[in-house]
A protein has these predicted regions:
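ATP-dependent carboxylate-amine ligase
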Residues: 1-52, 65-70, 88-91, 123
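A short alpha/beta connector and helix-capping loop motif
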Residues: 55-57
């Protein structure tokens, strides 16, 4: 899915799972942009990495922007103006969970799943393996890395899987 892709757009980019993936892909050399309904502390973190973040979700955010891949979560409805434009213009789209799987397939991945304790378990695992320099995307803030995600320098990838979107 990421072959022949340069410009990636995240609708709902301030979400904990979306922001982690956006930061990792930006660090990997992709041009990343996205939108959300409100600014959050993570917005500035992404802007500091060169990620363009639009506040508000309107067609103009995605129209004629050369988007190769549109990433969305279960929070984005078919009535969303950005989503509607992407569908009407046959731009490639992918759900957040599918993108996570696509990225993790390039690594030795560990995904933490379940109904309770995913964030705690994936965070503890991430801290325990920090010296192995893994890529990390979890559902909560990890004090040891001052983020919910980390660009790694190894073959390891730790993620929190979310049953709400089958990731």
């Amino acid at each position: 899915m990421l072959t022949k892709v340069n410009n990636i757009y995240f609708s709902g980019i301030n979400g904990v799972g979306m922001s982690g993936l956006a930061r990792i892909l930006a660090a990997d050399g992709f041009n990343v942009a996205g939108s959300d309904l409100v600014r959050k502390p993570v917005t500035k973190d992404m802007e500091d990495l060169g990620i363009k973040v639009y506040i508000g979700q309107v067609e103009e955010n995605v129209k004629d922007k050369g988007i190769d891949l549109f990433v969305y979560s279960t929070a984005i409805r078919e009535t969303n103006p950005e989503y509607k434009y992407i569908v009407e213009n046959n731009i490639k789209k992918i759900k957040r969970g599918e993108l996570l799987a696509e990225i993790m397939n390039r690594f030795d991945g560990i995904a933490v799943a379940g109904t309770h304790g995913k964030t705690t378990t994936s965070s503890m695992l991430s801290v325990a393996l920090l010296e192995k320099e893994p890529f990390i995307v979890v559902g909560g803030f990890i004090p040891e890395i001052q983020s919910n995600s980390k660009i790694g320098n190894s073959e390891y990838f730790i993620a929190e899987a979310d049953e709400s979107d089958n990731s």
